[in-house]
Regions:
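A short beta-strand submotif of the Rossmann-like class I SAM-dependent methyltransferase core
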Residues: 51, 76, 128-131
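Phosphate-binding glycine-rich loop
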Residues: 26-73, 87-89, 97-99, 121
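Conserved coil-to-alpha-helix start sites within the AMP-binding
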Residues: 80-85
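Active-site phosphate-binding strand-loop segment of PLP-dependent enzymes
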Residues: 103-134
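Structured binding elements
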Residues: 92
Length: 134
């Protein structure tokens, strides 16, 4: 089975926008960043948006915002980029994995349900579950 890592759709317009920034005086933190954040707010009807350099950073910030800390548990898929687990470790939490559905390579709903029932009996529910979608 080949699991696709990503399905990028990079247009000529995207490439031109990147080249424009690379040729400007701002490689980082230039006017394109707040413009992007504002457009994201408008698109999502959110009051605020913060652009970060990677999904790793975004997941870490999300865990902090949700109060993940030492003693907490985060569950994710074993078929993922390491950031899905590392974000918990950065916060001092424990990582555990939920089995996948072999037909989809995604987190199995049945495995998640069974694991939740067992965790509830033990009084050790996860604070965060990060599913991974390909």
């Amino acid at each position: 089975m080949i699991i696709p890592y990503g399905k990028q759709d990079i247009t000529k317009k995207d490439i031109e926008a990147v080249v424009k920034v690379l040729r400007s005086s701002f490689l980082t933190q230039g006017p394109s960043v707040p413009a992007f954040e504002q457009k994201l707010c408008e698109y999502t009807s959110a009051k605020y948006a913060v652009a970060v350099n990677s999904c790793t950073s975004a997941l870490h910030i999300a865990c902090i915002a949700l109060g993940l800390k030492h003693g907490d548990i985060l569950w994710t898929s074993p078929i993922t980029f390491v950031a899905s687990a590392n974000c918990a470790l950065y916060c001092g939490a424990t990582v555990d994995f939920v089995d996948i559905d072999p037909g989809t390579a995604l987190m199995s709903v049945e495995s998640l349900s069974d694991k939740l029932k067992k965790a509830e009996k033990k009084g050790r529910l996860p604070k965060i579950v990060i599913p991974v979608h390909f």
